[in-house]
Amino acid sequence: MNPLTQFNKILILPLLIALSLIVVAPARATPSCGMLPPVTLALGHYPSGLLNLMCNEFDSYGWNLKMMVKGDSDVYVIQNTFPAGAHSGWHTHPGPSLITVTSGTLTVYDAADPTCTPKIYRAGDSFTDIGCGDVHLVRNEGSETAVNIVVQIIPKGAPRRIDMPAPGNCPLITCP
């Protein structure tokens, strides 16, 4: 057998496997279900270095701030509306999010939690999402519409949200 032909066969098999994974992986992703389209309330663009912030003037109160961002960033302010039963689908973000529930109750499932214990947030509660590959799902398990406001810091031009497959350690959450 020609060594070049054998070499091409060796290269083609991994290429075909990789291509099949690229085609199949999105089919396993879990898009949102029942949510209203997100509303962008504001979008700001920050050049590299502008989000390098430090404040330790209030250390006497037990508070200081350090934030260092390398590269240009987009900062979004988003409103998400979850009718009863709606969920975000499993997803991640390329950067951190600061979330405040403004009405209703939301339940958050975190894939990194081995027991996938749900965390419940009510109107007035705030929580963070580190993003950067942290896979989670937000669901309205109540009977009234829930709304949250999210501030996201992400690399300039990156998608705000990346759909992910459902993790094996969490309950199966389907679209009602």
Identify the residue ranges that each predicted region occupies:
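Bacterial N-terminal signal peptides that target proteins for export
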Residues: 2-13
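Bacterial N-terminal signal peptides
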Residues: 12-22
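A short, N-terminal "cap"/entry segment at the start of jelly-roll beta-barrel domains
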Residues: 26-74, 117-120, 165-176
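Short, surface-exposed binding/anchoring microloops in extracellular/periplasmic proteins
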Residues: 70-94
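Short acidic-glycine-tyrosine-enriched beta hairpin
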Residues: 82, 111-133
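Histidine-centered metal-chelating micro-motifs
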Residues: 87-89, 107, 125-139
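Glycine- and acidic-residue-biased ligand/ion/polar-headgroup-sensing regions
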Residues: 93-113
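Ligand-binding loop in jelly-roll beta-barrel domains
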Residues: 122, 131-159
